[in-house]
Amino acid sequence: MKTNHVLIGFLAIMAGIIGFAVFFQEAFTALLVHPAVYSHARFIHIAAATLFFANAVAGMLWEQRSFASGSKAVILHTYNTVALLDALFSSPLIIILLLAGLSLSFNWGELWQVGWLSVSFLLFLLSGIFWVLGDIPTQYKIKQLISGLKPGDQVLPDQLIRLLRLRWWISMAGVLPLLAVFILMVYKPEIPAVADWFR
């Protein structure tokens, strides 16, 4: 399965949702603020956030274990599976998180006026930037390098080893903001809103 086509499809859906929210803000807000939606949105958001975070951490650990094995077959299988999970599992979860999170945020007040909420949203976006610009490209480069190895190759090339090590740090950079989002979401501290940063 060509996971990059699936990822592009989900990115297009996300762009469409963002476009709809920007150009048809009143209609978008009316859909998400409906009182009957709140409890469902909260449950869906908590479940999706938990699954998304767990998938990210499990993927990091699984990749680290495959790298420690030194086996080309194990590493290739791991990266193929992680890429598949990112395309079929993480991408839809991101869309669900975005919609449920926006629905909840509209019920809390103006997104950029609530401190913990606005900072959480920025951290979620930061994690997404690491995922799109760092995680996905290195994942595909690793798959490409591993599939180019000859069946008898016992030693992994230096470029591949460097990428495998780099991915740990890229993944960590993407997961740490999510951990901070969880903390903000649970404790809801009184912190300055993002809108106040620019006044």
Pin down the residues of each PLM region.
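Polytopic transmembrane helical bundles with strong interfacial aromatic enrichment
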Residues: 1-199
